[in-house]
Amino acid sequence: MSQVLNVCLAVGICLLLAFGPLAFGGVQAWAIFVLEAGAALLLMIWAVRGIALPRVEITPNPLFTPMLLFAGLVAAQLLPNRSAYWYATWQKALLWAAYGILFFLSTQCFRRGAWLKRFGIACTVYGFLVAMFSIAQEFVGNGKIYWVVPNQAAAQFVGPYANHSHYAGLMEMLVPFPLVLAMAGFSPIPMRVLYSSAAVIMGSTIFLSKSRGGILAFAVEVGVLTILSARGRRTSRQVAAAGLFCLLLIFCLMLVRPNGLWERFMQLGDPVDKAHDPSRVTLVEDSLKMVRQRPLLGWGFGTFPVVYPSFRSFYTDLAVNAAHNDFVELAVETGLVGFALGVAFIFLLYRTGMNRIKHWRHDPGVSTALAALVGCTGLAVHSFSDFNLQVPANAALFFVLAAIATGSTSEGSRTTR
């Protein structure tokens, strides 16, 4: 019974993570409901599993502390007259509670090497299929998502995402899995070739998306993976592997030929009319004004779209729903206290994650943790210029990867209740 419930939990987490991107990134109300209800159902299954066992074993995670403190901060904002818009804070609190549940359950479920390896392979297969769909839609598409749904967003759509940068965010988190599996010593050579091919195709679609922040984050990922994988070893092999991957990627890009990619980067040098065509820097400047007015606890979780128009320094007939910088938006909505907890989360993520990856080459579980840590790195870098953590599908995957990167596989680390 317990084993069956364990399988249900692991499969359920993977299905929820797979559902989000296919549902246009999980940004619509019905998709958010599925994510929240699915997370609650999985928590109930875990509780039933605990009742069926003679004792409940809970695997601790260092990130539980900043997450619980952050939950307490949001709970304080739900008190009367604490949030600029109580309902928006409540809605976002429910969504992030779902992320917290997925984080907790992932820590409990994915603690054995075999399950971690399966998760890494599942991410590879899923990412490859989504990438192939995106390439097909790019070259034989009709301007509609899934060839059926018109794109009403202002941004270019790629794959199932209405925003090309959010598609890049998904691939940033998934590409490290085939990359690490291709470099690991436990994979046979034919499988390494397949993993390498999947990584090249998935990586090429980041360039196909023409997301400048995504391309920069992907480049940082490759560099970080090269450095982390070479810890305690000769670096020549890791550098050669990274160089070979880049050459294969360039060859793939020559075949795919993303139209307008160079022009996208050339736009960075264009003069900006802050009054009518603001840049992300303008959004950040306006957001910092908001922080100065409520520096301690912020305006309320999820209230940025409501409060920002009062501080906007430019004219637009479009709704500005995010700061295009997740860290700045965190400071706006939860103040310096929430920002400090976010920094603590990132610090503990890397301190704990880097302590786990010493023997990644011959341990499938540790190699998956390495890939998860690199995936989190990519999204964190991208978050300086975009709002991927405001996209439910990407945020849910980020927190699951954080759980895998920091979770313990040691039997002695569990606590009994």
Task: Please state what every model-predicted region is.
Residues 156-160, 218-222, 253-286, 292, ...:
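Flexible juxtamembrane loops connecting transmembrane helices in multi-pass membrane enzymes
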Residues 20-26, 80-81, 148-160, 278-282, ...:
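Juxtamembrane membrane-water interface segments that cap and precede transmembrane helices
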Residues 89-92, 271-273:
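Extracellular loop and loop/strand-boundary signature of outer-membrane beta-barrel proteins
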Residues 1-3, 7-26, 33-47, 71-78, ...:
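Alpha-helical transmembrane segments of multi-pass inner-membrane proteins
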Residues 50-60:
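Membrane-helix interface linkers and caps
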Residues 79-82, 142-143, 226, 294, ...:
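A short secondary-structure junction motif
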Residues 163, 281-321, 327-330, 334-341:
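TM-adjacent membrane-interface loops and short helices in multi-pass inner/ER membrane proteins
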